[in-house]
Curated annotation (Swiss-Prot):
InterPro entries linked to this entry: NTF2-like_dom_sf, SEC_C_motif, UPF0225, YchJ-like_M
Family, similarity comment: Belongs to the UPF0225 family.
Protein name: UPF0225 protein Ent638_2310
Species this chain originates from: Enterobacter sp. (strain 638)
Gene3D superfamilies with a match to the protein in the record: 3.10.450.50
Pfam families to which the protein is assigned, alphabetical: SEC-C (PF02810), YchJ_M-like (PF17775)
Length: 152
C-alpha cells in the first residue's frame, strides 16, 4: 500500500519528501524545503527540523519545545500560495497556510517564510505573519472569506 506525502504534493511519500528527511538528498529550493519541513512536523521528526533551521537560529537549544509541540497538534494540510526569489538568488520566500487541530480546536499558521542558501543547502531562517482583514479572500485558496476559513 502506498502512502501519499503529507506535504500535499499528491506524490507518494517515497517519491517526494522522504528523500530529504532521510538525508539522501538536500531540498533543491525553498518550496521543497518548506514542504519537507511541513512533513517533518506531521511525522514528528525534530532532527530534520533542527537540521534545516539556519545555524544562527540555534534550533537545537529549543529541541524540547519542538518535541512537546508534537503532542497535541494534528496537522491537517499545507497550501503554498506564493513563492519568490529574494534580493539575491541565495534568498527565497514561501508564503503558505498550514492547517492544524490543537486541543480539539482548528487553527492555521499563515506565514511568509524566508530561506537562505548557504554551503549548497537551503535553510529556514525566519518568517513574517501577514495580516488579513476578516473579509479578505482566504489565502488557502478555498474561495471563502478569511473569517469563515483559516481566520476562525
Amino acid at each position: 500500500m502506498t502512502q501519499l506525502c503529507p506535504c500535499g504534493s499528491a506524490l507518494e511519500y517515497s517519491l517526494c519528501c522522504q528523500r530529504y528527511l532521510s538525508g539522501d538528498q538536500l531540498a533543491p529550493d525553498p518550496s521543497h524545503l518548506m514542504r519537507s519541513r511541513y512533513t517533518a512536523f506531521v511525522i514528528k521528526d525534530a532532527d530534520y527540523l533542527i537540521k534545516t533551521w539556519h545555524p544562527s537560529c540555534q534550533a537545537a537549544d529549543f529541541r524540547q519545545e519542538i518535541v512537546s509541540g508534537f503532542t497535541n497538534t494534528q496537522w491537517q494540510g499545507l497550501t503554498i500560495y506564493e513563492t519568490s526569489i529574494g534580493q539575491t538568488a541565495k534568498e527565497g520566500f514561501v508564503s503558505f497556510v498550514a492547517r492544524f487541530i490543537e486541543h480539539d480546536k482548528p487553527g492555521a499558521i499563515i506565514e511568509r517564510s524566508r530561506f537562505i542558501l548557504e554551503g549548497g543547502q537551503w535553510y529556514y531562517i525566519d518568517g513574517t505573519r501577514p495580516q488579513f482583514s476578516r473579509n479578505d479572500a482566504c489565502p488557502c485558496g478555498s474561495g471563502k472569506k478569511f473569517k469563515k476559513c483559516c481566520g476562525q
